[in-house]
Design a protein with these regions (language model features):
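Basic, glycine-rich polyanion-binding accessory segments appended to enzymes
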Residues: 250, 258-340
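Anionic-ligand-binding alpha/beta catalytic cores of soluble enzymes and soluble regulatory domains
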Residues: 177-283
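Conserved small/polar residues in nucleotide/adenosyl-binding loops
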Residues: 342-349
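ATP-dependent adenylation/nucleotidyltransferase module used to activate substrates
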Residues: 1-153, 163, 172-173, 179, ...
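Short, glycine- and charge-enriched coil/turn segments that flank and shape catalytic ligand pockets
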Residues: 34-36, 108, 122-131, 209-214, ...
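Short, glycine-/aromatic-enriched active-site segment of Class I SAM-dependent methyltransferases
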Residues: 160
Length: 350
C-alpha cells in the first residue's frame, strides 16, 4: 500500500475475497519539510495506515531505506555518472517491490502480493509460463495507464506470486470506487516523475547523494569540434534541447555523451533517428529464449508508442533490433520492451 488511490482500491477489491494484510514500504528519510512528493513519504504512510484501519486490515510498515539507497538510488547515480540514462522504476519493481517485499511476506506465510499496477498477468497452459500482458479497458481497448513497461523485469517466480486487480480498469473507474468506498485519497493526484526526485532535478539529487559537484566541459559538434561549454555531463540526456542555448545558428540537440572525457555532443534533430539498437541483460517472459529471429513491436520509453521491428538473437543474452522505420533518441541505459499480440517479452537497452 503506497498510500495512493490505486493500491487502496486494490485492497477494496480483494478484502472480501481473501485474507488480506497491508504492507507499506518506507524508502526515504523525512526531510523535515513537506515530503508529499516522495513515494513512501510520511503522509503516504499515514494514508495507508488509515485506509487499512478503515477496513480492519492489519497494516505493516517495512523499513527498506538502506536497501533502496544501496540498490535503486546507487544504480541510478552510477548510471548517470557513466553517461547512461536509467529508469529506476524498473529496478525498484524487480528488486524492491517484487523482490525484497515478496521475500519478506513469504517469511510470514503469505504466498501472493497484490499491487495497484495497471497490468495483467496469466498462466499459459501451452507454454507452461506466466505471461505479462498490457492493461486494457473493459471494452478491450488499450488502457492509457498501462504499466507493463516498468514491470518487464519480473521473473516467472515473481509473476506467479503477483496479483494485479486493476488490469482491466480505467483511472476514472478507480477513483469512482475509491469515492464510493469513502477513501480519504480518492482524489489524490498521481505521482509524477521519479519518486525520489519529485522536482525533476536529477543532477541536484546526484550531487546530494555523492557529496560531489561535477565540472563543466566542452560541447562538441558531430565532427568532434569544440563549439561551446556545458555545465556538467549529468545535466544532459540524449534528445535534450532545453538548456543548451541558442548561439549555434540552428536548433541543437544532445546526440551523445562521453562521461570519461566530460564531453557532450550536439547535432541536428535528424541525427537522433536510427533504425537499429542492441540490447543485452535479457529477461524473456513468454519463452526461455528465442530460437530464431521474430517480428513484434517494441518501445524504448515508458510513454512511447510501440513500433514494428524485427529482433535478431545474437547468442542467449544479446539481440539486435531493427525497426521498420527510424525512431528518435535511442538512449544508452534505457530499456527496450518487446510486445506481440499475445505476450510481452523483453531485454534491457544496451
Amino acid at each position: 500500500m503506497s498510500g495512493g488511490v490505486d493500491s487502496s482500491v486494490a485492497l477494496v477489491l480483494l478484502k472480501d475475497k481473501y485474507e488480506v494484510s497491508g504492507y507499506t514500504l518506507k524508502l526515504h528519510d523525512s526531510r523535515g519539510t513537506d515530503d508529499s512528493g516522495l513515494c513512501g513519504s510520511a503522509s503516504d504512510i499515514e494514508d495507508a495506515k488509515a485506509i487499512a484501519a478503515k477496513f480492519g486490515v492489519p497494516h505493516y510498515l517495512l523499513d527498506m531505506r538502506d536497501l533502496f539507497s544501496d540498490t535503486v538510488q546507487k544504480s541510478f547515480v552510477q548510471s548517470y555518472l557513466s553517461g547512461r540514462t536509467p529508469n529506476p522504476c524498473v529496478e525498484c519493481n524487480e528488486t524492491i517491490k517484487f523482490g525484497a517485499l515478496l521475500d519478506a511476506v513469504k517469511k510470514q506465510g503469505i504466498n501472493h502480493i497484490a499491487t495497484g499496477h495497471y497490468v495483467r498477468s496469466c498462466y499459459d497452459e501451452k507454454s507452461g509460463r506466466w505471461l505479462l500482458k498490457k492493461a486494457i479497458n473493459a471494452d478491450g481497448t488499450s488502457n492509457a495507464k498501462d504499466q507493463s513497461y516498468v514491470l518487464y523485469r519480473l521473473s516467472q517466480q515473481q509473476l506467479a506470486a503477483s496479483v494485479f486487480p486493476l488490469g482491466e480498469m480505467t483511472k476514472d473507474e478507480i477513483r469512482h470506487i475509491a469515492a464510493d468506498s469513502g477513501l480519504i485519497n480518492s482524489d489524490k493526484p498521481d505521482s509524477q516523475d521519479i519518486c525520489f526526485v519529485p522536482d525533476g532535478d536529477y543532477a541536484g539529487f546526484i550531487e546530494r547523494y555523492t557529496g560531489n559537484t561535477y565540472p563543466d566541459g566542452d560541447f562538441l559538434d558531430e565532427n568532434g569540434n569544440v563549439i561551446g561549454r556545458h555545465k556538467g555531463v549529468i545535466f544532459y540526456t540524449i534528445g535534450q534541447r532545453r538548456g543548451i542555448g541558442t548561439g549555434f545558428g540552428k536548433p541543437m540537440y544532445v546526440i551523445g555523451k562521453n562521461a570519461d572525457n566530460n564531453t557532450v555532443t550536439l547535432g541536428s534533430n535528424e541525427l537522433l533517428f536510427t533504425d537499429t539498437l542492441y540490447a543485452d541483460n535479457l529477461n524473456w517472459i513468454a519463452f526461455e529464449y528465442p530460437e530464431s529471429e521474430f517480428k513484434c513491436k517494441a518501445k524504448t520509453r515508458y510513454r512511447q508508442t510501440e513500433q514494428p521491428c524485427t529482433v535478431y538473437p545474437q547468442g542467449r543474452n544479446t539481440v539486435r533490433v531493427v525497426f521498420d522505420e527510424k525512431i528518435r533518441a535511442v538512449t544508452p541505459g534505457q530499456h527496450v520492451v518487446f510486445l506481440s499480440l499475445i505476450h510481452i517479452s523483453e531485454p534491457t537497452r544496451h
